[in-house]
């Protein structure tokens, strides 16, 4: 009897060389069938054509009803997920006196409520197998509220606490939940010119390295599971 194909779902997959794309690619290389979820259909389709074992499922995770339908479609097409990775962010920046309160709700919906639905749609199958991995991409905003980042930070903190609650409830049942706090500027074609164009390479975390750490976490022995995983470049002040 042949071994069941492993299935991975990744939200927030952007352009090639970005974190989401690198996560999808490394799991695809490891023989997972990877369902990529993001709003940009063209970018997903381009990745699907270029790399093996990764499949395009365009969807805005902030549209919760469509997101749930997409997750059901993935299960019907590929099978129940063994690994799910919530990488989709919504990040509003600005003074709390000026930001639209609707943006706070949007940040919460993408960062936290979408995680809840991702887990609810995929966890039952994991529980039936008594194994599975749920990984979440976070950052230092989940641990502190900096000026002008109140909307983003408050919803990422909620995301982290939700993830911890899921880990405490379902870890004893064989489900590994890990929250990645990425304390770094990530080296992507979009981030480098926008944030710190003159910084040396050592200032940035590489998307490929982040993806590799996520894959390593899935392989951890049950006797040494991580929950809070902090990643930063060696030169980062903290």
Residues covered by each model-derived region:
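The beta1-alpha1 cofactor-binding region of Rossmann-like NAD(H)/NADP(H)-dependent oxidoreductases
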Residues: 58-69, 101
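A short, exposed helix-loop element centered on a Lys and neighboring polar residues
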Residues: 119-120, 164
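C-terminal helical subdomain
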Residues: 172-175, 179-181, 196-238
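Canonical Rossmann dinucleotide-binding motif of NAD(H)/NADP(H)-dependent dehydrogenases/reductases
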Residues: 2-34
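Conserved NAD(P)H cofactor-binding loop of Rossmann-fold oxidoreductase domains
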Residues: 87-93
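Substrate-binding pocket helix/loop in short-chain dehydrogenase/reductase
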Residues: 95-96, 100-105
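Catalytic loop of short-chain dehydrogenase/reductase
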Residues: 12-14, 133-158, 164, 168-171
């Amino acid at each position: 009897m042949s071994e069941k194909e492993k299935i991975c779902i990744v939200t927030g997959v952007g352009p090639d060389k970005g974190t989401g794309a690198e996560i999808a690619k490394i799991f695809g290389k490891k023989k997972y069938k990877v369902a990529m979820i993001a709003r940009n259909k063209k970018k997903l389709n381009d990745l699907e054509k270029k790399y093996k074992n990764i499949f395009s499922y365009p969807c805005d995770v902030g549209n919760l009803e469509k997101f749930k339908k997409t997750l059901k479609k993935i299960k019907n097409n590929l099978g129940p997920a063994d690994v799910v990775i919530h990488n989709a962010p919504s990040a509003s920046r600005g003074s709390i006196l000026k930001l639209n309160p609707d943006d706070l709700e949007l940040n919460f919906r993408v960062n936290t409520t979408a995680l809840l639905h991702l887990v609810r749609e995929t966890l039952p199958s994991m529980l039936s197998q008594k194994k599975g991995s749920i990984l979440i991409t976070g950052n230092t905003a989940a641990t502190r509220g900096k000026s002008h980042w109140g909307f983003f930070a408050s919803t990422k903190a909620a995301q982290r606490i939700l993830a911890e609650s899921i880990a405490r409830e379902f870890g004893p049942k064989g489900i590994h939940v890990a929250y990645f706090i990425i304390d770094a500027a990530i080296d992507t074609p979009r981030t480098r010119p926008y944030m710190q164009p003159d910084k040396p390479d050592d200032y940035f975390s590489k998307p490929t390295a982040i993806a590799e750490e996520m894959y390593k976490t899935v392989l951890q022995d049950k006797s040494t599971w991580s929950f809070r995983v902090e990643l930063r470049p060696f030169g980062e002040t903290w």
